[in-house]
Structure formats: C-alpha cells, structure tokens
Amino acid sequence: MSVAKSIAAVLVALLPGALAQANTSYVDYNVEANPDLTPQSVATIDLSFPDCENGPLSKTLVCDTSARPHDRAAALVSMFTFEELVNNTGNTSPGVPRLGLPPYQVWSEALHGLDRANFTDEGEYSWATSFPMPILTMSALNRTLINQIATIIATQGRAFNNVGRYGLDVYAPNINAFRSAMWGRGQETPGEDAYCLASAYAYEYITGIQGGVDPEHLKLVATAKHYAGYDLENWDGHSRLGNDMNITQQELSEYYTPQFLVAARDAKVHSVMCSYNAVNGVPSCANSFFLQTLLRDTFGFVEDGYVSSDCDSAYNVWNPHEFAANITGAAADSIRAGTDIDCGTTYQYYFGEAFDEQEVTRAEIERGVIRLYSNLVRLGYFDGNGSVYRDLTWNDVVTTDAWNISYEAAVEGIVLLKNDGTLPLAKSVRSVALIGPWMNVTTQLQGNYFGPAPYLISPLNAFQNSDFDVNYAFGTNISSHSTDGFSEALSAAKKSDVIIFAGGIDNTLEAEAMDRMNITWPGNQLQLIDQLSQLGKPLIVLQMGGGQVDSSSLKSNKNVNSLIWGGYPGQSGGQALLDIITGKRAPAGRLVVTQYPAEYATQFPATDMSLRPHGNNPGQTYMWYTGTPVYEFGHGLFYTTFHASLPGTGKDKTSFNIQDLLTQPHPGFANVEQMPLLNFTVTITNTGKVASDYTAMLFANTTAGPAPYPNKWLVGFDRLASLEPHRSQTMTIPVTIDSVARTDEAGNRVLYPGKYELALNNERSVVLQFVLTGREAVVFKWPVEQQQISSA
C-alpha cells in the first residue's frame, strides 16, 4: 500500500469533508470570498495535557525540562510514524494516542478578547472580557493600554486553557494597514499608518500576549497576520482568496511589511500567518521570498517560530491561484516555501501523495511540526503542574475583567470630530431623545471575532441608568430606505431637550469576506438626521463602525452641533459614550484613518495597491492623498485648549552628519538605525477650563531625496493623562534614525542629506527643523527577490 493510501485510510474519520482530486466541482474562489472549510478545520476540541509523570512520554526527552525546547520537540516528532507526522500538520491535530500525546487545536482567536473558546452556557468560563475593536483602541494613542489589553487576554486565555477550553496559540494581532477605506476588516487593524501605528500596536500586543519580549516561558503564542499585502475581501467581486496584488518593492518595504519587521525583530513574535492573496504572481503561502528571505533571513524571525497558513490558503495555492498544478503540488509548494502548519486539511490529506511522488521529504514536514511543538514546550504544555501559568483560574478572569480596561480603552479611543460647545452637555439638560439603529445594540458593540461578554452596555442602557429622562425611538435601520419610523423619532425629539442620533455602519456592511463599494452613509440615516436638525434642538450625532463614512454634510450643517466617532466600543461602549457626552470624561482620541469624501471611492479601483498618486488615483493614506479630506488622519478635538511649546534653550543640536550617525556605538539596540536621532520634547499646558488627557502625533516631512515626496509621515505619538487646567507637563517623543529615512525604488531605507521638519499634530503647533549632512546612506538593505518555488 502506498503512503498516500495508508494516510488516506487513517484520515477517513479525521477528514470527513476532504475532497479527492478526482472531484471536478470546485468553488470558484476568484469570486467566492469564504473558504469552504471542512468540519475538522473549524472544530473546537476539549484540550488536555500530556502526562509527563506517568504517561508513555514521561521517560523521553520531551518531558525533560532541562533540555532545549527545540531538542525536546525534535525528540517527540522523531517518534512519530510518517502517518502520525502528517496527521499533525493541520490546525486540528489528533495528537498521537499511542504516545499519550493529546489532540491539539492551533486555531484560537484573540483579536480583542477570547474567541473560539469552549465557553460554558453559564457560570464559570461562560464569558471573557470583550474589548473595543483595535481601530478604536489605537485611536487612544496609548501604548500602555494596548499592552494591558493583551496581557489581560493572555491571562484569561491561560485560565481557560488550564481547564481545556482554549488553545495556547492565538491568531492575532491583525497588523495589516487600513489602506482602502472600503476594506471590511479595517476595523480589526490599528489604522492606515503601517510604519508607526501598526508597528507600535504589533509590539505592544505581541509582548502582552506572549508575556514579554521572547520570555523563557511563553504566556501564549501570538500570530502576526496577514503576511503580506492583504487588505481586501471581495471588492467588486475580487475575492481575497484569489487576489493577485501588484506591489512594487518600494511599497512592499515601505508600507506592507514594516509592521511585520517590528513583530519579528523587536517583539519576537513566535508565529506569523501567511495570507490568502498572491503578491506579484506568487501566493503568500508559497512565497519563499516572504517566508524565508524576508521573514527569517532579514527580519530575524525567532529560530523556532512557525508560519501558519490562513485557513485553507495552502489549498488556495492551487485553487484559485493555479500556482501549483494540483492540490498535492499546493501542499508541497507551501511546506517547501516555509508554511509550517496548515490551517485546513490540505497538508493532512495530500502530503502522503506528495511524499510518494517525491515532491516533499519527511524532513521538510518534520521541520514545521517541530517548530509548532517547540513553541508548545515553551508554553509549558509538557510541564504538568509545574508550568508557570498553570495556577491561573476563573478567579483571574473575573479579577482582570474588574480592572475595567475595556471601558478605559473605549473612553480613551472615542474621537470628537465636531463640537460647537454643545458638548459636554449642560447641567440644565434633563431629557434626551435617543434615536437611531446603533442606540439599542448588543453584540454589535463588539464588531467581529468576539465571544460572549460578561455584559453589554448599549447607549440606551447607559442613559436609562443615568439621571436623564429618556425618549427612545429606533428611527431607521442601518441600510433601510423606509421612513416608517421617522414620525416616532421626530415625536421623541420634539419632547426632549437634546437629540442624540446613533448610526453609521456595522458588520452587515463591513466584515470578513465583505467590503463596501462606497463610503457614504447607508440607507436613509442622513435624511432622518437632516429632519432632526430642523427642529431647533441641540443635535449630537454618534458615527459608529470601524470604517469611515463621508460625514461632510454633517460637518457643514450648523444645526448638527456635535459629531463623535465611536467605532466598535466593546462591552462598556454605551457607558463610555455617555461619559464623554456628559463630560464625566473628556475626549482625546484621534482618527487613525482618513475620512475621505464619497467620490474618493469611485476614482480608482481598490485593487490598486500603489499609494503614490498616478492616473486617476489621487494617492492613498494621509501620506500621499492629494485631495481634501473630510476629516484628516490625526483629527480629534478636546473639551479644553492646550498650548505646546519647546522647553529648550535654543542650543539643541539641529544638524547631524549621516556617516557619524551610522558609525556610532549603539548599546541596547540591535541595529544602529533604531537609535534615537533626537528626543522631541515639548511642554504641554492646559489653557482651558476642563481637565483632560492630551494626545499628540509627531509628523516628519522633507524634500530631501528623489521625488515624489510624501505629504508627511508619522514618526511618533504619545498620550498624557489627566492634565488639570493651567497645569503643564512635559512630553517626549523619541525620533529614531530609521524614522526619518525614506524608501528607495529597490526597497532600501535611505538617509538623504537635506532639510527636515518635525511638526506636532496636523495643526503644526510646534515645528522643529533639522538638517542631515554628508552622503546619502542605506540604513536598511532590502534583499533582491528570488523565489525558490516556481509556478507550475
């Protein structure tokens, strides 16, 4: 019997939905954006731990805590038969019963709380904290907050794992940049800035999840996704499963991968997910340039870090990309390129045939499985009750939820877009009309990738539990064109002191496998808002959802007094919105995306990956957009006023020689370009009457080096907590050498001699000029692309 037939026999029960290659009816994944996963792939299983005291493995090296993790994992895998080896290459692995190795599920989710956990129906382990979606959390510009959230998720995840209800690897964070305003999953990301925001988010989230920077005992394993060039779902019928994105080496280096460099080199992430799409003709999961040359050889991915495919993307190497000649070839191409574990069943079902046809070796398959189990060793999977985190219980879930960080993330991230002084509400306001499809929501507060929360506070809940008299009317639905609810809404508004409308978009319009085709307010929400604005009452609009919509009509309507963006604010979202509106908390969030005018979505195809303006493309992101945004990236108002000033004496160094910078000692930094060029220090004074946090973005610009030049780019950000009126505080934003480099056409990061500016926020409230002298120099060398795997 051939190896392929032997494995097929073993996997009959394991893979009930697997396809045979003789089957000629396949889903057209060039159009369909949802993979047809087998029941085995999506299964959640009851997890347990190997018995290293009395079980079959107890006398083997894998149970020897004094041995190196790699050696322990290699010793384990060497005991597998070939069939057992192949069986354990998928996300749902059956383990090896004869060795006492339990089944394991790689696929757990932790985007903003636990998902794909085995929650109970009630009582202990029936919920976990549900934080705001990442795009709202990033708008707080608070690195510590991101790390706190990830740390809590990891604590709760380990508590669930200790009772077999959650895995030790999580498919998070999503650190793709939110390039296209129509992308359905932009809500999952830290925004449109890749170099600074996505990289900072990656670092803080990964180190929070993993328990530090490459700790000896990992808390959980984070997975940086989706690598690389993934930022569309199904725009205009272009499926994410079949997209082939044309990206220059310049923009691949500059925009689509710097966050993955930071994840690998600095945060020491232990897992990376290759994406569905192809880039320049090569599917990401069969792209040896991505997975070996860049990730391992250039970015410094940890030695036993493993690459997981996105779910079914190894299969997609054949269908629909047709990079491989058949499914067997897709499995072989993916493992040889560097995809270690298949989220799916392609490896499990087709490695036997690939082995028989000498397309793959046992050593190549072993390499990936050893990497996975090496991480499980680091996670204490084989250490029994001696594992560092084995004592975490349900009490730790309850305790960490009580820290109320979910509320803090929501209230810090909320962005005040417009305000004429109506907010915070005057003490004299007694009655409020609450209107709109986002006012009485539950799970909608959570966005996507969520599990059950301990509670969900809608805006309506929060106001009903306050001292206000509430007049509620639904008004209209997100995408409705029916005006049946208008009269009730207008009636509620007329008998109230203040009108609050909550609407925008939700996951019926933006989601995984679903992009938008426009960026307008859907349905007849604007029509209802316009009628409400004619009543002569103060009107506050809450614009909800992850992606932006064109709110220019609300911005220009003087009868719309205030406009707030609230994202997907999580379990405490309604309370956070109430507290901002009433002034219990002051807003300080800033947009981490650009709000474009509606016509932007019609000017060029969303599949155009070039950020630089060309043809009908007016440029993408705040760095290159040549039009006039409705609200800029970085926009955000306060309830008070601030004054920023440079505290220096005028003697600070403003000229730097490039060669001197790159030849200086750099203790504490792996690379000289990570050294601070300077520290941008400003004094911030609250000149108003309201205590408030203060947030800042620091931008650089220059005309040094070759054209075209970006408008500006972000080099740093920070947040000061609760600055009282008439008080001052110092803020320091380090500016690294690399952050003022530009990317040349070959993808190299280059320092160019010339004049540079650093400007604080869009208002340019403080500007610092400096000069780089000497010869231009490469600070980061981008490798020449060479593929080890060729197309069939």
From Swiss-Prot:
GO BP of this protein: arabinan catabolic process; xylan catabolic process
Compartments it resides in: Secreted
Domain of life: Eukaryota
Biological source species: Aspergillus fumigatus (strain ATCC MYA-4609 / CBS 101355 / FGSC A1100 / Af293)
Keyword Glycoprotein tagged: yes
InterPro entries xrefs: BXL, Fn3-like, Glyco_hydro_3_C, Glyco_hydro_3_C_sf, Glyco_hydro_3_N, Glyco_hydro_3_N_sf, Glycoside_hydrolase_SF, Ig-like_fold
Sites where a glycan is attached: N23, N87, N118, N142, N246, N326, N385, N404, N440, N477, N518, N679, N701
The keyword Nuclease belongs to this UniProt entry's keyword annotation: no
Similarity comment: family membership: Belongs to the glycosyl hydrolase 3 family.
Protein name: Probable exo-1,4-beta-xylosidase xlnD
